[in-house]
């Protein structure tokens, strides 16, 4: 999915509001995903999955940091996330559908914290971006 110039501007605008809240928003996203899609917990058997867990916060921060990295290299998301793609495809073997679940939960968290920023146009751009990230992360599964 190709991001237009407007999409890139919209995504960068949203992430300028998000990047300072990586741990908080990342943890919220993971907690929401584990609640809405309990099967995703199977990839984290060694984690304390309780609300406020230090492990959830740390991993959530990593998730948002990876998204920020993708935003910072929005014209080369595949290059920016290549190592992460290898990790998820070859070592962790995460079911590709989970990236869609994560993206959806991230959109909800953004909507909760920045409702006025998430216009229909921005929502569509952010969704396209998250789909592009998911596509990159699953590209090496084939």
Swiss-Prot record:
The keyword Metal-binding applies. Heme b binds at residue 88. Keywords: Heme, Iron, Metal-binding, Oxygen transport, Transport. InterPro entries: Globin, Globin-like_sf, Globin/Proto, Hemoglobin_a-typ, Hemoglobin_oxygen_transport, Hemoglobin_pi. The keyword GTP-binding does not apply. Red blood cells. Transmembrane segments: none annotated. CDD domains: Hb-alpha-like. GO terms for molecular function: haptoglobin binding; heme binding; iron ion binding; organic acid binding; oxygen binding; oxygen carrier activity; peroxidase activity. GO terms for biological process: hydrogen peroxide catabolic process. One of its GO terms (cellular component) is haptoglobin-hemoglobin complex. O2 binds at residue 59. Residues 2-142 form the Globin domain. Involved in oxygen transport from the lung to the various peripheral tissues. PANTHER family: HEMOGLOBIN FAMILY MEMBER, HEMOGLOBIN SUBUNIT ALPHA. Heterotetramer of two alpha chains and two beta chains. Belongs to the globin family. This is Hemoglobin subunit alpha-A. It comes from Anser indicus. The lineage of its organism: Eukaryota, Metazoa, Chordata, Craniata, Vertebrata. The gene is HBAA.
């Amino acid at each position: 999915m190709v991001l237009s110039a407007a999409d890139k501007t919209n995504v960068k605008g949203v992430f300028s509001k998000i990047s300072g809240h990586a741990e908080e928003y990342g943890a919220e996203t993971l907690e929401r995903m584990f609640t809405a899609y309990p099967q995703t917990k199977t990839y984290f058997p060694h984690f304390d999955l309780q609300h406020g867990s230090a492990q959830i916060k740390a991993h959530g921060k990593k998730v948002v940091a990876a998204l920020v990295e993708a935003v910072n290299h929005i014209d080369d998301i595949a290059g920016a996330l290549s190592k992460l793609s290898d990790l998820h495809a070859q070592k962790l073997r995460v079911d590709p559908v989970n990236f869609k679940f994560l993206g959806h939960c991230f959109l909800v968290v953004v909507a909760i914290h920045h409702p006025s920023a998430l216009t229909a146009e921005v929502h569509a751009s952010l969704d396209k971006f998250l789909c592009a990230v998911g596509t990159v992360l699953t590209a090496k599964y084939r």
